[in-house]
Amino acid sequence: AIPCNTFGDVVARITDYSKAVLKTPWSCSGRGVRYVRDIDKNTERWIWKTLEKQGYIMVEPYYDKVKDFGMEFTSFADGTVRYEGLSLFRTLNGTYVGSVLATEDEKRSMLTKYIPKDLLDSICRYICDWMSREINGQYVGPFGVDMMIIKTHSGLKVNPCVEINLRRTMGHVALSLSPTTREQQCLMNIGYDGNSYHMRIINDHELLY
């Protein structure tokens, strides 16, 4: 992603990419994300408003996504970072809708259908080392890094940092509900009925990752 601090920079990047994803630096649960091919009046107003309030917009290519996933961590006051587990989740129009509840081994098996296990391990080590240096005790608590498997002309690849969430994520919630031994896999689903959000556990295997 490229940070753009002027309207002209944003337009130039969208033109370069043909179809782009625009993200506000600070947002939550997909609310600061726009998928843009052409800039209409609503998008133009949103860009100007975001630049005025937050100073810049992150612009990146629109990737041909295959799967969403993430890794969950905890950072400590001494600067160390501990890996907590994988997060396999589903989104709709960029907004989180549910997480797979399964053991770590089962989740790794799901992902290694697409990418090598060694790649997952190296990404995890890199994040632990890099975040330990960058945070260095300035933030203490849970955080998550969202990622995606994407399709390219040269095969499947990983975007290892779609965004970093310095908070307890739904991935952490899913880890606390996930089985520690092999059981029937479930989906932790978040739904909205027009008035409030509700969480439910779905056992339908066809809805899983």
Task: Describe the function of each predicted region.
Residues 1-4, 19-46, 70, 94-111:
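Glycine-rich phosphate-binding loop of ATP-grasp-fold ATP-dependent ligases
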Residues 1-4, 87-89, 187-195:
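A generic structural motif
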Residues 18, 38-97, 144, 148-161, ...:
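Phosphate-binding site of ATP-dependent enzymes
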Residues 77, 94-97, 107-109, 181-182, ...:
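Glycine/serine-rich loop-strand microenvironments at binding/catalytic pocket rims
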